[in-house]
């Protein structure tokens, strides 16, 4: 009391600038177990706020629960959450565990009402009960009404998304926050080994579902005057202007890049009422990383896949070399059907295969009696299935043996005992991956799911951010590829001359002018022997033929309308014209003109968004999956074009596709270095990030198409091989050139 009085006197006299305020907490009035913690929490509240309690003596309540309604003291970050999101109604997909579950928990502590949706009811019930108990301890009134659950929700199912929105509206009357957290890990295979249905499933569950829910909540959020949408992406989906290669998970990388690119390009359309952002966690110390329910953890799965793919790539390379040396496919597969490394070292076995088996047998095994079977067996049946698929997609298997003989060969293959891969090597590789990840983290540690959720809850409280991606893992020191590089210069004549007499494939539908410009340049400067134009419809071929006119060499162009049978069309082109020196892939459909009813009454519905993904992303995957198996080919992927006079919605969605596509290009560039075919892949962008830089008239449009043609020729001309220069061979792959 004297201290306080002296401080006030000194402030009045000018001897002290700031007032020192004093209180004392008397603890003798409380004997409960949590009394000291409660006193500490109240002390922190007094010290770190500007509150001035007139009473000098502050007595502890004899019963904390009766006095506060809380069964435990609240201090630290929990106290800082109180009221942060008070009254908000939240829909969280994938809310039964992991980051989604922790977001639900912390938002509920922050005062929000949450609807947690997921597939497994038992996990949802356990989490809900846990959150309710915590809310009761904090002192929330009727906490069981603040946390609702909805099970059997698969975000790949459109009807489940409709059900989720309806259930949230029924429970709370409104939706203030949408958190798109649910998703799948993907097929975890190299792109050439991915099945199209697996690719589509990943993109539908992780990306199309996000847009579908966004489309459903935007009108109601606009009407109520506020809203917040959060996409849970991943650092391996890249960041603004940057693509991060993620080998063996191209479908996942593309879906996560799409989630991020979506918010960057939708923000201007949903504001000012609605904020839309993404978070991009890096590796998180949690259930998915460690594994659960008998499923191996992420690092263990990646380690096993890396080691299996190393063997598969060795086998694939040996088969290609044996065929190049003159062996028949029947002879190679006939030798391999024993699946016995020892037997395959005999002189009558094709040399390339025999040399590989000698090398495998000589590898150190770490023990006299290895407990794994890869020392004696070439491959597992799943590996054999992938090898046959590679030969089939690489157009090395005649149509007659596509199914019957190939399937019989796989079924007749002796099955190696488990484990196939040395568990000690898997463990060592997993540790290597883990240490590599730790070394890339700025914090030199992986955050927990709670760490990520806590940072995100505070991020969501900022009302001045939209269209951005937040990295709650502290960021990664990762190899990165800039998404947009300007086109400067042209292909060197000595490189272009190496294309003389070769075959080029141009694949597309509606982009007749750019394709015609590229064809003219290939004929005039590349002096290619033939061009195969693969279109979806015959009308598109006619449009390209018209755009070409009587260009020099136009008679060296053949046209094929493949419809939706793209792979079969490429097979036919390969059979008729041989291995292409370069393949240029352009989208099979234009970008829609509308989005959220901003321009006109039309809007981009979820099925139309799904079609956009199919024609602009999956289309390129289907091309790349085959062409990456053509030894000697170069692959160029083209992002969509927005014609002069296009809408803002078209421009936004074209940039969305461009950014998302480069996640695939960058990843494929790394993966293809590991394949024996070593096909370089690059991307050419026709859409710029700034709309003011887009062509305004026909003359500027023609200039852009000329630049496009030169960019395509630059990427299509033969580049240096890895054995000549590892450095140059590497930096020329996975790039994106903007024209």
Where are the regions a protein language model picked out?
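Conserved glycine-rich cofactor-binding loop
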Residues: 96-97, 510-512
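Substrate-binding pocket helix/loop in short-chain dehydrogenase/reductase
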Residues: 189-191, 198-200, 437, 594-610
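A short, exposed helix-loop element centered on a Lys and neighboring polar residues
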Residues: 214-215, 264, 624-625, 666
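Conserved Rossmann-fold SDR core element
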Residues: 270-284, 331, 377, 387-388, ...
């Amino acid at each position: 009391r004297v201290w306080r009085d002296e401080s006030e006197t000194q402030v009045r006299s000018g001897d002290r600038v700031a007032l020192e305020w004093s209180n004392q907490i008397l603890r003798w009035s409380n004997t409960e177990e949590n009394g000291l913690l409660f006193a500490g929490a109240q002390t922190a509240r007094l010290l770190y706020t500007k509150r001035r309690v007139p009473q000098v003596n502050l007595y502890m309540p004899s019963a904390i629960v009766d006095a506060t309604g809380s069964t435990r003291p609240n201090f630290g970050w929990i106290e800082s959450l109180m009221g942060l999101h008070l009254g908000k109604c939240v829909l969280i997909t994938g809310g039964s565990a992991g980051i989604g579950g922790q977001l639900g928990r912390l938002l509920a502590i922050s005062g929000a009402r949450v609807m947690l949706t997921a597939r497994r009811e038992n996990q949802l019930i356990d989490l809900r009960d846990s959150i309710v108990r915590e809310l009761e301890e904090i002192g929330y009134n009727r906490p069981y009404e603040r946390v609702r659950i909805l099970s059997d929700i698969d975000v790949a199912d459109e009807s489940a998304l409709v059900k989720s929105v309806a259930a949230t509206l029924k429970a709370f009357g409104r939706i203030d926050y949408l958190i798109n957290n649910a998703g799948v890990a993907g097929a975890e295979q190299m792109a050439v080994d991915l099945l199209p249905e697996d690719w589509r499933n990943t993109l539908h569950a992780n990306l199309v579902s996000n847009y579908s829910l966004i489309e459903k909540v935007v009108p109601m959020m606009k009407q109520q005057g506020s809203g917040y949408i959060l996409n849970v992406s991943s650092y391996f989906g890249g960041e603004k202007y940057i693509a991060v290669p993620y080998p063996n998970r191209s479908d996942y990388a593309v879906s996560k890049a799409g989630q991020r690119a979506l918010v960057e390009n939708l923000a201007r359309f949903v504001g000012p009422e609605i904020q839309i952002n993404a978070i991009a966690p890096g590796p998180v110390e949690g259930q998915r990383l460690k594994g659960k329910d008998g499923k191996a953890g992420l690092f263990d799965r990646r380690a096993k896949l890396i080691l299996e793919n190393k063997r598969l790539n060795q086998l694939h390379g040996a088969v290609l070399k044996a065929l190049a040396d003159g062996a028949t496919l029947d002879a190679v597969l006939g030798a391999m059907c024993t699946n016995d490394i020892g037997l395959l070292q005999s002189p009558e076995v094709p040399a390339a295969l025999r040399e590989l088996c000698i090398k495998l047998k000589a590898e150190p095994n770490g023990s006299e009696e290895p407990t794994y079977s890869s020392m004696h067996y070439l491959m597992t049946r799943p590996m054999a299935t992938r090898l046959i698929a590679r030969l089939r997609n690489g157009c090395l298997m005649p149509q007659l043996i596509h199914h019957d003989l190939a399937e019989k060969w796989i079924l007749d293959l002796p099955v190696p005992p488990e484990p196939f891969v040395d568990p000690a090597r898997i463990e060592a590789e997993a540790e290597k991956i883990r240490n590599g990840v730790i070394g890339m983290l700025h914090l030199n540690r992986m955050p927990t799911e709670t760490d990520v959720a806590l940072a995100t809850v505070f991020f969501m409280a900022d009302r001045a951010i939209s269209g951005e991606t937040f990295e709650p893992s502290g960021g990664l020191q990762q190899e990165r590829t800039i998404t947009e590089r300007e086109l400067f210069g042209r292909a060197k004549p000595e490189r272009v001359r190496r294309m003389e007499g070769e075959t080029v494939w141009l694949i597309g539908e509606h982009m007749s002018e750019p394709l015609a410009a590229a064809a003219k340049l290939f004929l005039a400067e590349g002096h290619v022997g033939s061009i195969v134009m693969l279109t979806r419809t015959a009308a598109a071929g006619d449009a390209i033929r018209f755009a070409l006119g009587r260009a020099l060499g136009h008679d060296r162009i053949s046209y094929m309308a493949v419809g939706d049978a793209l792979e079969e069309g490429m097979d036919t082109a390969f059979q008729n014209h041989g291995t292409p020196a370069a393949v240029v892939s352009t989208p099979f459909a234009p970008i829609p003109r509308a989005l959220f009813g901003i321009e006109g009454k039309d809007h981009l519905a979820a099925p139309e968004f799904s079609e956009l993904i199919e024609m602009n992303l999956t289309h390129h995957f289907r091309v790349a999956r085959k062409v990456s198996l053509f030894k000697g080919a170069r692959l160029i992927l083209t992002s969509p074009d927005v014609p002069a006079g296009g809408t803002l919605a078209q421009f936004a969605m074209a940039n969305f596709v461009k950014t998302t596509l480069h996640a695939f290009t960058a990843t494929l560039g790394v993966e293809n270095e590991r394949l024996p075919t070593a096909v370089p892949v690059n991307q050419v962008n026709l859409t710029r990030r700034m709309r003011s830089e887009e062509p305004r008239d026909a003359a500027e449009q023609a200039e852009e198409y000329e630049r496009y043609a030169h960019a395509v020729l630059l990427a299509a001309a033969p580049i240096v091989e890895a054995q000549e220069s590892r450095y140059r061979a590497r930096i020329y792959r996975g790039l994106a050139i903007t024209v």
